[in-house]
Amino acid sequence: FVEQAINTYKENYPNTPVLPDDIKKLTAEDFNKYGDIDIFDGSPPCSAFSVSGSMVQGSHSKGWGQTKNYSDGKKVENIEDLFFEFLRVAKDLKPKVIIAENVKGLTVGEAKNYLFKIINTFEEIGYDVSHKVLNSVHYGVPQTRQRTIFIAVREDVTQEIGLTFMNIQSLFPDESKDVVTLEDCLSDIEVDRKEADTLIEKFKKTSHYETWLKMPDDPDKVETGCDYHPKGHHFNMKKTSRHKPAPTITATGGAMHWTEPRPFT
């Protein structure tokens, strides 16, 4: 595991226990020593189903069954199966509620076969489950990010409180019509000019810079690099609009400042 990521998490959540171990090696005992768990919340790795990655709607994903290389030098095979390792731990923990998250791509094309398998596994371990694709932009986040969310309630709990399978869908939060823009959330944040200028100089040395120069300055909407490249390249580079939420920010970046040739600091 990436040591810097673990240290960052500990810095932000100093009172939260951290188990930096392979989930395949974790058992319920590793969690129970911290007390009973009512809600088990997890986000198993999802790159195999990502639309922005190798997933192509309606066709077999090139990412399935492959080896994933991580920045810590480790390799993980069949990363899509880690969802079931998460459910294996949940089965032994027996929490009242399970919350799980994955990419929207899980609900389209051949990935639906995995979705159905996940739902069946929830039911096999004794949970009533419902899923829904939510967009973070509808919940006060200045970023368009769609994710498949699962809510599962242990069967004896649903019977005790009179919650039917159909009513689990009502547990998902209502969407807000109020949209938070980038300007709303960033206008009062002081920019570290040294860091920003370093990023600008670095970006100017890339092939993306010429495309960025062709894009409108301070656009009214998010602009995509491929629309300004003669061969349609740089599709993952997007110039943001301060009047809109950011597009989905991926692990490789791509979301650029609306007036300066740099990603966000």
Stretches found by the model and what they are:
Residues 134, 186, 249-250:
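Bulky hydrophobic/aromatic "packing anchor" residues in well-ordered structure
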Residues 71-153:
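Conserved Class I SAM-dependent methyltransferase catalytic core
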Residues 200-265:
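C-terminal target-recognition/interaction regions appended to catalytic cores
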Residues 140-207:
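Flexible, glycine-/basic-rich loop-and-beta segments that form/coincide
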Residues 1-94, 104-108, 113:
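Core alpha/beta nucleotide-donor-binding catalytic domains of modification enzymes
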Residues 23-28, 134-137, 232-234:
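Short alpha-helical segments and helix-capping/turn motifs at coil-helix boundaries
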Residues 3, 45-47, 104-105, 137-139, ...:
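Short, solvent-exposed loop/turn segments at secondary-structure junctions
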